[in-house]
Amino acid sequence: MVSSYPLPDGFSEFDVFSLGSCLLVEGLLGILLNAVTIISFFKIRELRTPSNFLVVSLAMADIGISMNATVAGFSSFLRYWPYGSDGCQLHGFQGFTTALASIHFVAAIAWDRYHQYCTRTKLQWSSAITLAIFVWLFCAMWSAFPLIGWGEYDYEPLRTCCTLDYSKGDRNYTSYLIPMSIFNMGIQIFVVMSSYQSIAQKFKKTGNPRFNPNIPLKTLLLCWGPYGIMSFYAVFENATLVSPKLRMIAPILAKTAPTIDAFLYALGNENYRGGIWQFLTGEKIEVPQIENKSK
């Protein structure tokens, strides 16, 4: 029974229920929205383009994050992690792989949009597929290192989900965190920032903005910035001295990424939105196309 398991340190009954409910809602909503994004891609022929393949690849990564959140939400209602140490390692690996992949695909979409709007060149299928394969393998590689001793997976403060352990802040953790962050966050932030800055300048010249180029970077930093701050804080200070409730803000915000991405890159994309509408209702909507040229 739930009552037989003690509350995690620093959390009340209400805290555990509220955080568990947030994780469960985030997980189920993310699964629903990204499942619609993925199914629409395969059902509607007009959506099956190389650029949209990056969007559906992002949705696949995000649905993985949402599944991770759903498991964490369910465990929160139990008040404990029911899957043992091996389950914790698997949960950490799966969550970290999909999180890194999500960040990479956000950067890939920014890079593709830069070429669409600024250089008027079209992404080819071979490039899109190669890029997606590289992203998944690269992210899986970095996520596998903690399984073999470089870095470590352990419980979040709520002790009902697992992630990269920042509580120790030792040399092993620091030596892993710095290169991992550079190759899986720093470069991606630079790509997103520079790509959308160029797009914003292009929109300003043409006077025909197709979307708000300031939003993608802001949402990326909103979702993943708190994790980055806490991770680097642990390099210099004892992160366990920070309130457990405050430390749980990072995973809660991170798991909003799948829902935000679905609205931003699928429902917020007039071409993709039209395909989703056609899938759901059978009604086809004609949208203006970007004039591209192949390399």
Predicted regions and their residues:
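Class A (rhodopsin-like) GPCR signature focused on the TM5-ICL3 interface and adjacent 7TM helical core
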Residues: 105-117, 146-157, 178-234, 264-266
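Extracellular TM2-ECL1-early TM3 structural module of rhodopsin-like
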Residues: 12-21, 50-111, 115-123
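Alpha-helical transmembrane segments of multi-pass membrane proteins
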Residues: 27, 57-69, 131-143, 181-189, ...
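Intrinsically disordered regulatory tails of 7TM GPCRs
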Residues: 1-7, 205-211, 215, 270-295
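Seventh transmembrane helix
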Residues: 222-231, 248-291
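Cytoplasm-facing ends of alpha-helical transmembrane segments in multi-pass membrane proteins
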Residues: 31-42, 66-70, 97-120, 131-133, ...
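Loop architecture of class A 7-transmembrane GPCRs
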Residues: 2-9, 80-97, 128, 140-186
